[in-house]
Amino acid sequence: MDLARKAGDRCYDPSTNRCLISRDTFWYAISLLFAGTEEQRRRGRELFATVTVDDCTHTPATLLAVLLRIPDALDDSLRTHLEGAVSQALGDAALVEFHDGNVNHPLAAYATLVLGGERSGQEWAVRLGTRRLRAFRERIGDHRSRYRRQAEMSEYNSLTYTALDLWFLALVAEHARTEEARRLALFLEQRLWVDVAMHFHAPSQQFAGPHSRSYHEDSLGGYSGLHCTMLAAFDDPLFLDPGLCERFDHPSALLQNSLAAILAYHVPDEARDIAWRKPFPYAFRMTTYGESYHENSRRETSHGSPSENSPFAFDDEIYPGGWTDLTTYLTEEYALGSAALPYVNAGHSDCLMARIRRGQKIKKLSDFRSIYTRGVFNGAEIGEKNISHVAHTPVDRSYLYEEGRSAVYQHGGTAIVCYTPKRAGHAGVTGFRLDLIFGFHGPFDDLVVNEQPVGALPLSLGSDTLICFRDYQTFGMIRPLPPSPAAGQHPVRLRHSGEFLLLSMVNYDGPPRDFSRHEINSWRTGFVLELATAQESSWEEFQTRARETHVTEVVEHGIVRTVRYTSGGTTMEFSYDPFKEVILSRRWNGVEESPNHFEVEAAGNRKGPFCPQMLYGEELMS
């Protein structure tokens, strides 16, 4: 509550009577109801009485949480006022449906319909919310094609938005009077806790990837809405650094704690055991299904005066949806996760995420490291305010907009990562690069480039660069794929940027140029990342093996990319069409790998208490 209240004190604007937006203002108001002085509590009640509801999802669900969880903090007139605001939101909430994309807003709408309908006697809303909860469960758990069955929801493993999913499901599970709605919400909440627990890497106290949507604190690690929700629900100690939200100008991530703190959660014992006691190595693959994407926003972004306002949009492009799969591999020392193909437009997705523990206990940011990627146009810089080139929209410091399209083949601790620029950025290009981003609150124990220890930075390197690092008990090797086109003879660059270390693979860096969408879609870049532990070999042996690795890339008909990587007697081969965004083949030692539903392996076992057989399927409902 203190985190939320202090953030609200900083953000509150007396001229608008708001903290950012109405939802966040109500989160601030909740925190004031628990403050130490009557003046603060009175101010909280005033905010509830005077701020209007601007949406039909998060905000009315928040008001319902207040009415259901802390009714004694309100007087009769204020409770009646909030009941009326929720009732007025029901009509618009009825228009919100799940379409294989965003999950948190539909779940908030369904909570509003069920609970708001029950409280106001509007049975149509209860029936509709229950029916949509049922359809949501059926879609994410039972959706099938000829070769695949869906295992994971579309907006998966987001350290911000998965937390919201848990809140709204927990609220319905605890308070719905309608038996089917309560049963569905409880099932979904508890299975989502199992999902969260599978991704939790207890040695680093971070969540393994991939992540459908991430803000900087989510990607960097050390604080997130999901960390805070897990802390509230599990009551096990976790390292948190809320200062990251101030560094990256993301106060909502602090304000929301007031809502997370007042809810009742229903964590199954299975999830607690998997989270904290899973054996290593722990590996899982799961299918998911996402909507196709087309830019359709008509909202405007304010720049100070109406004449300077600009449309708020995302990518002016169409991206195919459909099936893809997610791979996660955890050892005692590190966790590596990847998405074979992006989540929708991948505005701020982590298609690849590595978490490395750097100490026996996690007490500060330098005790772990995160590694992830972004493709960026025109000099966009991590941790700073930018103009997204593909969206033509200002982006604040809370996230770095993803301006590339990715495809990843991961097997165990090794990943082949292919990137191409987003077609929407084809005009007015002054630069495009792929950044492999390292959190850098502490140096590597060893960092070696082309067999030489790294001294002063920055470095400009050739495409055939070999990079090895030692981080506590984890060893890593990176081989860039030669960028095509390449920005000069030394298109690989290593440099510091604030609290980050960036390994950049640069396709273009020069005067403004316009390209056709087809031409820029043919640009290519990427890298191979291989991780290992000190339990597998010595640092010297790892470097020797890294020098003997080999990577090649062949492009057929100017379209299909095939990357072949050999290491220590094993071979990975990855074929991908970046124009259609279709993976054609993934072979490990010549054997095709194509996940069709859900598979878990815990220390070599595929059955047992740490190996759920599915997440949301109908078979588990009984």
Language-model features: where?
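Ser/Thr/Asn(+Pro)-rich, low-complexity disordered segments
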Residues: M1-A73, S77-V96, A108, R132, ...
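Extracellular polysaccharide-recognition and catalytic grooves
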Residues: P60, A65-V66, T80-R299
